[in-house]
Design a protein with these regions (language model features):
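Hydrophobic, Leu/Ile/Phe/Ala-enriched alpha-helical segments that form helix-helix packing faces
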Residues: 12-24, 87-95, 115, 119, ...
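Acidic, low-complexity terminal tails and accessory targeting/binding regions
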Residues: 22, 40-53, 97-101, 113-172
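A mid-sequence, solvent-exposed acidic-amphipathic segment
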Residues: 69-103
Length: 172
């Protein structure tokens, strides 16, 4: 399990693991470690220079900031595709390699909103698009190497996919 280092995210991860463990009658003997990852902190995965980007977050609020980010219109920020690919690669590299593995990544609504918008090719996010409390994105990868893999995801009941390599080419 990976999590933003913010305590409420670490606590959420621990409670989700506890809830999953209690959903079965079988005794669990595993110990799932929660590894804190800076790329999952808000809006850490997308920021290059917080002194440049920070004032825009305070001025625009989360929704305005993420809309500016997905349009690559903020100073001190990574290109949206680069920022999202960094997070996706983290998820790819921390996923268990066996066929029955499942991993959990706990982050913030702003990170989730940005990822969903960018991988969906959207340039505008509305309040209705914004992730609800505890709403999650289900992702998986097909392929043995990240850059050659296909990302598949389910968001609000819709299944989508994209080639990581082709996605990265859109940055140019």
């Amino acid at each position: 399990c990976i999590s933003s280092p913010i305590q409420r995210c670490v606590d959420t991860a621990a409670l989700m693991i506890q809830g999953a463990d209690s959903s079965t009658l079988a005794q669990n003997t595993h110990c799932i470690e929660i590894v804190e990852q800076g790329l999952l902190v808000e809006p850490g995965s997308f920021v290059l220079d917080i002194k440049q980007a920070g004032p825009y977050f305070r001025k625009q609020g989360a929704l305005g900031f993420i809309n500016s980010f997905v349009n690559n219109a903020l100073p001190g920020m990574k290109h949206p595709i680069t920022g999202v690919v960094d997070v996706l690669e983290l998820i790819y590299n921390t996923h268990p390699q066996d066929h029955f593995g499942l991993s959990l990544a706990v982050s913030h609504d702003t990170i989730l909103a940005a990822i969903i918008a960018v991988i969906s090719g959207r340039h505008t996010i509305t309040r209705e698009d914004w992730p609800k409390m505890m709403e999650g994105l289900f992702v998986w990868f097909e392929g043995d190497k990240f850059l050659e893999s296909k990302l598949k995801w389910i968001w609000r009941g819709q299944v989508n996919e994209l080639s990581i390599r082709e996605f990265q080419k859109l940055e140019k």
